[in-house]
Amino acid sequence: MKHDFNHKAETFDSPKNIFLANLVCQAVEKQIDLLSDKEILDFGGGTGLLTLPLAKQAKSVTLVDISEKMLEQARLKAEQQDIKNIQFLEQDLLEKPLEKEFDLIVVCRVLHHMPDLDAARSLFHQHLKEDGQLLLADFTKTEANHHGFELPELENK
């Protein structure tokens, strides 16, 4: 999977992906109060399509991804926009969790790539502060699209 996303890094910011990231960012802004006080984890944040707009409003954002090329693109954009409150980590949190908890964890179009939903759920809970929030944005299963989830799969987790 890492190789696939390294290969896609320079072309990942397509109009479709930018549009989807903007929708998620709007949902975060509507559902989360006082972003300026929040420490956010963008799990699998890739090229920073969510990280950068959130960092402009949040106390800090940690972008974690397994693809060094995706992170390279995110760093370049952060430098161009002079955004300094982002920590970039190339790391698989399932293998090496962080020793930090967050107010908000954002997981956008990543969960369907993870082979073990229970391990992912445990990982997110491990990294959330007691009153923290988890925002998941992923695909739903349809007859045409088998990637993603049916809502009951996630609701009781």
Model-derived regions, located:
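Short glycine-centered segments of the SAM/dcSAM-binding site in methyltransferase folds
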Residues: 39, 131-133
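Class I SAM-dependent methyltransferase SAM/SAH-binding core
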Residues: 41-95
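Short N-terminal helix/helix-N-cap motif within the alpha/beta-hydrolase-1
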Residues: 69, 98, 115-119, 144
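A short glycine-rich, Lys/Arg-flanked "PGG" loop and its adjoining helix->strand segment in the class I
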Residues: 118-130
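A conserved beta-strand element that flanks and buttresses the S-adenosyl-L-methionine
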Residues: 106
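Conserved class I S-adenosyl-L-methionine
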Residues: 1-35, 73, 143
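Short catalytic micro-motifs in class I SAM-dependent methyltransferases
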Residues: 109-110
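C-terminal alpha-helical "lid/dimerization" subdomain adjacent to the S-adenosyl-L-methionine
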Residues: 13-19, 133-157
